[in-house]
């Protein structure tokens, strides 16, 4: 039976995260997608996501996979068929058949996330669902200096929220960029994996640096400490976006 890899974009505002919450009645991306797939296929299909994005988090490049029988829709036509039944805040971008052992989460070799700040004295009603309003001017140079210290292979326990224990908190961060196009500032992170709330805590820490509440040269000691209390706050979810999930050969 074909294993299908599907790329999605979504506005996470109205959803309680990606993962289905059995019996809760709360809308999630997974539940909505599975319901629409069932409408097209006439069968219950289980979807596996590359990232279990939290409530309010958005995606430009979420990847899922699901195994399906022959249902009369060519794989390349699945996005068009799905977009006919999906709500307007979710879009199917691409579909392809992949090997049977492909797993959207465990086959991923890298993920890229962005966190957007709206750096202007007056808030924007048009950006409020997709960025964090920061009215004070930011020291972008200091933020870039701090971001360099995040690069490389580290134990990122300092930037891990409680609730999802892992065997190892060691990750390799290959990108930590501060992109500014006033009034927007985008923090972009690429790594071989991320801990729970790691991006939001790193963003909160860099924001503290930008607001001159934290010395950028303190980052190495903060990372080495493994102490969550020494990092910055966990910024709200609505500024976060899953940009891309990468795989070796699919």
Swiss-Prot record:
The active site is at 54 (nucleophile). Its EC number is 5.4.99.12. GO terms for molecular function: RNA binding; tRNA pseudouridine(38-40) synthase activity. Homodimer. Formation of pseudouridine at positions 38, 39 and 40 in the anticodon stem and loop of transfer RNAs. It comes from Desulforudis audaxviator (strain MP104C). It is an enzyme of class 5 (isomerase). InterPro entries: PsdUridine_synth_cat_dom_sf, PsdUridine_synth_TruA, PsdUridine_synth_TruA_a/b_dom, PsdUridine_synth_TruA_C, TruA/RsuA/RluB/E/F_N. Pfam families: PseudoU_synth_1. The keyword Isomerase applies. It comes from the Bacteria. The keyword Lyase does not apply. Keywords: Isomerase, tRNA processing. One of its GO terms (biological process) is tRNA pseudouridine synthesis. Substrate binds at residue 113. It catalyses: uridine(38/39/40) in tRNA = pseudouridine(38/39/40) in tRNA. This is tRNA pseudouridine synthase A. CDD domains: PseudoU_synth_EcTruA (cd02570). Belongs to the tRNA pseudouridine synthase TruA family. Gene3D superfamilies: Pseudouridine synthase I, catalytic domain, C-terminal subdomain, Pseudouridine synthase I, catalytic domain, N-terminal subdomain.
């Amino acid at each position: 039976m074909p294993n299908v890899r599907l790329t999605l974009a979504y506005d996470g505002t109205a959803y309680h995260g990606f993962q289905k919450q059995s019996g809760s009645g709360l809308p999630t991306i997974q539940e909505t997608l599975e319901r629409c797939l069932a409408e097209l296929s006439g069968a219950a299909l289980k979807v596996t996501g590359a990232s279990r994005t939290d409530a309010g988090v958005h995606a430009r490049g979420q990847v899922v996979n699901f195994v399906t029988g022959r249902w009369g829709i060519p794989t390349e036509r699945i996005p068009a068929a799905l977009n006919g039944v999906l709500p307007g805040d979710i879009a199917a971008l691409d579909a392809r058949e992949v090997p049977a052992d492909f797993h959207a989460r465990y086959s991923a070799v890298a993920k890229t996330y962005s966190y957007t700040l709206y750096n202007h004295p007056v808030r924007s009603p048009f950006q409020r669902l997709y960025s964090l309003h920061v009215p004070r001017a930011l020291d972008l140079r200091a933020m870039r200096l701090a971001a360099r210290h995040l690069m490389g292979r580290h134990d990122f326990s300092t930037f891990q929220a409680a609730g999802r224990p892992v065997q190892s908190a060691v990750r390799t961060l290959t990108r930590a960029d501060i992109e500014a196009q006033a009034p927007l500032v985008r923090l972009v992170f690429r790594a071989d994996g991320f801990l729970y709330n790691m991006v939001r805590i790193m963003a909160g820490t860099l924001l503290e640096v930008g607001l001159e509440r934290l010395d950028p040269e303190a980052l190495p000691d903060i990372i080495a400490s493994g102490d969550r209390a020494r990092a910055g706050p966990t910024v709200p979810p609505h500024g976060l976006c899953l940009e891309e999930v990468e795989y070796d050969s699919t």
